[in-house]
Amino acid sequence: MTRQSEQILENELVKQLQSLGHSFVEIRDEDALVANLKSQLEKQNKLKLSDKEFAKVLNHLNKGNVFERAKILRDKMQLTKEDGTSVYIEFLNQEHWCQNQFQVTNQVTMEGVYKNRYDVTLLVNGMPLVQIELKRRGLEMKEAFNQTLRYKRHSFASGHGLYQFIQLFVISNGVNTKYYANNKDQSFKQTFYWSDKDNKKITQLKDFANEFLEPCHISKMICKYIVLAETDKILMVLRPYQYYATENIIE
């Protein structure tokens, strides 16, 4: 197996994600992330937010753990504007999941306990919802998994804590690719391969991206196929056979 540097793998993936319909946005730090969030929420909600109004939105978002934030993401926020009128801010259009703003960025640096630079992030309406961690070909997937654990420990909560809105992680070394929901306690056992309708595993990053990371599909996974389990306060993402079974019932 040829060893492919992580950088090449990352650049190719970013290009591919753009061709699938994610707009590329350069975000290097939290300030840029916050500025982009404002413009994307304005676009999604077809309104303008003053700095004061946006500060209220940020305050509303910066609460709770991963589970509580998953709920905030799915609810609308009632905002009283400076002129006294009231509007609802939608963070995620769950009913028409294709009708959201889709972006991709890479190499975002966040500084918490330690400084971390993340590989590839998918943003929906400016919210970082999918984190993709890559290791060069030939390296163990567990390394990428452990890397995501370090990010969560060291820097996801920094600043306005926007990275705590991550719903799904994707880890890949190019030839093997898995996905899993974001939770407080993570186990490598809870990472899954995606499959096609005939239950054939899709392991290659390129094929996985085409099937799973296409904007409408990844948005549908987040909106419809992540279950917020109240009892354990965890996010549960459906596995392929559960996904196809549910889709068949709906059809």
Sequence positions of predicted segments:
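ATP-dependent helicase/translocase motor core
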Residues: 2-251
